[in-house]
């Protein structure tokens, strides 16, 4: 799926970003997002402009408000760059939440391709975690998906320790879970 960006205030930004299909032989090459300033190519190294967990996305961004001096130290101190980065993260979270709410079965089908981005974003960006906790999914051994809240409600009665804290059981290897 893709995200179209078109912002006029408080900064100018147009672009399109899309999530590539993740395969087992994942290509972790960054530099798949091209940055333009007034339709003139600037760089394909967008660290600092795009949140780190989203640099695996593909696409094109064009903004006259991004400085042509793209040194890392300059970008970290530029307020427009921080606003653009936060806006991109917000738009991605909004689009994912919209997909989850409007068509959950389709979202669940795409989850295996999206989960790498979402989980990495939740670990690296607190603001993204707050938004993504609503639509991040856990998969049980039967292949059914649950949100964090759904999983908590399902397991709260029988998966607590002696202090009453909920214990989450999780594995990435289904080979061993079938014997349990």
Question: Residue spans of the language-model regions?
Answer:
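Conserved GHKL (Bergerat-fold) ATPase module
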Residues: 1-178
